[in-house]
A protein has these predicted regions:
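Canonical Radical SAM [4Fe-4S] cluster-binding loop centered on the CxxxCxxC motif
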Residues: 3-44, 415-417
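Radical SAM enzyme [4Fe-4S]-AdoMet core and its adjacent flexible, acidic
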Residues: 137-145, 152, 156-259, 263, ...
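Cysteine-centered iron-sulfur cluster-binding motifs in ferredoxin-type domains/subunits
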Residues: 12-20, 69-72, 264, 320-322, ...
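Extended hydrophobic secondary-structure segments that form protein cores and membrane-embedded regions
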Residues: 8-10, 62-68, 95-100, 240-243
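Flexible mid-to-C-terminal extensions adjoining Fe-S/redox cofactors in radical SAM and related proteins
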Residues: 283-394, 399, 413-417
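Radical SAM/AdoMet-radical enzyme domain recognition
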Residues: 49-51, 55-64, 73-198, 208, ...
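N-terminal [4Fe-4S]-dependent radical SAM core
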Residues: 1-11, 56, 380-394
């Protein structure tokens, strides 16, 4: 069965960025494009990407704009993108997400983002001492004050903003401080991304700034208790993407987070030059699927190479296949399997996930049970309302009126007999 491409990740400025963060894995991607110092997507490639995606018979589609730093393209580029979406759209619901470091966001940007309802992922690790540990400007100074000001500007302008916080060897110590900081400045939607980069000396080991498994497990447990403690009337008041995704699994729904899926390969990445890859973490020659100028995105999504990439996630070690948490973890993200176990690879964060699921399991089960019961009650209430409405309608029908069942005969000779 052919897959549909309902979401796509576009990197219009490639790996280019106006910051110099210590832990950035995108900097390595500069080696893929040695022929240019500045990388910018042309209007022709932009047109083809949007036209191909919107040619599908799907009701909802989403565009995710990332980098590097996508705002380096300038506001006119994104206005053009919206214009093309409106030009090629066929009454679909089109969503746009923009991941940014926030440095270039000003009033005009904020007004544009609010007007077209962009969902923003803002790279902000936490309060000043956390954020400025590794996130530097090009001059070597910290970027926190500029990024926080951008957050406040966008929130004041009505823009939906998610905090994207990289959990590293330092920030992992401060879950309470980071969580409360985000709430205090109005960032109630949060995504915590474990920093896992391999050492340049030994690829089987993690880099010094990467988060270790056990501290990350403790971080997740403490964060979960904070999240749960803020519930009101049985419902969350803050959103943490990983917890939301795990809840989906307990509720029997597909999770939004791809790391928890059984198989990868449900979307593709388009680089600035139109090259298409299997995943943002695998922008390398082995997983290059083709090129937008000469190919079709839907065909690339359904190609043998993309299928092979997706099935890589299913290749699990015995420790995983025999684990009681497999139905929740699914081995985690493929890129994080660099901790060797026997002759294959185990996810570097395996012990962290085990710690977290053991800590949260009973409470997730209760949350899922309460949600299902609420859904059942709402369904029964809707059914009862329909029955009552039907009964009221029936009482209004005269004996000589057409029967409401649609038979075409009089009520007295049909349902009114």
């Amino acid at each position: 069965m052919q897959k549909h491409l309902d979401s796509i990740l576009i990197k219009p400025a490639g790996p280019d960025c106006n910051m110099n963060c210590t832990y950035c894995f995108y900097l390595k991607k500069l080696k893929l494009f040695p022929e240019k110092k500045v990388h910018r997507m042309t209007e022709e490639i932009l047109d083809k990407v949007i036209r191909q995606l919107l040619a599908q018979t799907l009701r909802e589609l989403s565009f995710s704009w990332q980098g590097g730093e996508p705002t380096l393209m300038g506001l006119p580029f994104f206005q053009k993108a919206v214009d093309l979406q409106q030009k090629y759209g066929r009454a679909q619901v089109v969503g746009n997400g923009l991941q940014t470091n926030g440095l270039l966001i000003d009033k005009k940007w904020a007004e544009f983002l609010n007007t077209y309802k962009f969902l923003i992922g803002l790279s902000l690790d936490g309060p000043e001492h956390v954020h400025d540990k590794y996130r530097y400007l090009r001059n070597g100074k910290g970027s926190w004050s500029k990024v926080e000001n951008s957050a406040k500007l966008m929130l004041d302008s009505g823009v939906a903003v998610n905090a994207l916080s990289v959990v590293n060897d330092y920030s992992v110590r401060f879950p309470e401080e980071i969580y409360e900081y985000f709430k205090a400045i109005g960032l109630e939607y949060m995504q915590f991304i474990p920093c896992l980069e391999t050492s340049s000396e030994d690829p089987s080991k993690s880099a010094s700034f990467s988060v270790s498994a056990d501290p990350y497990g403790i971080f997740l447990c403490r964060l979960f208790d904070l999240w749960l403690g803020d519930f009101k009337e049985g419902k969350p008041t803050t959103s943490i993407r990983f917890f939301d995704s795990v809840f989906y699994l307990y509720a029997g729904l597909p999770p939004p987070e791809c790391t928890l899926l059984e198989e990868c390969g449900n979307y593709v990445i388009v680089e600035f030059n139109g090259d298409v890859y299997s995943c943002d973490f695998f922008v390398e020659d082995l997983w290059r699927l083709g090129s937008v100028p000469s190919g079709n995105l839907i065909e690339m999504l359904n190609s043998k190479r993309q299928k092979s990439f997706g099935e890589k996630k299913k290749a699990l070690v015995q420790d995983c296949t025999e684990c009681s948490w497999l139905s929740l973890c699914r081995g985690g993200c493929t890129k994080d399997r660099f901790q060797y176990t026997k002759d294959t690879k185990l996810n570097h964060l395996c012990s962290a996930y085990k710690m977290f699921f053991q800590h949260a399991d009973s409470r997730f089960k209760k949350l899922a049970s309460d949600w299902k019961n609420e859904q059942a009650r709402e369904y029964q209430a809707r059914q009862q309302e329909r029955l009552e409405e039907s009964s009221r309608s029936a009482k209004k029908i005269g004996r000589n009126d057409p029967c409401s069942c649609g038979s075409g005969t009089k009520y007295k000779k049909c349902c009114g007999r």
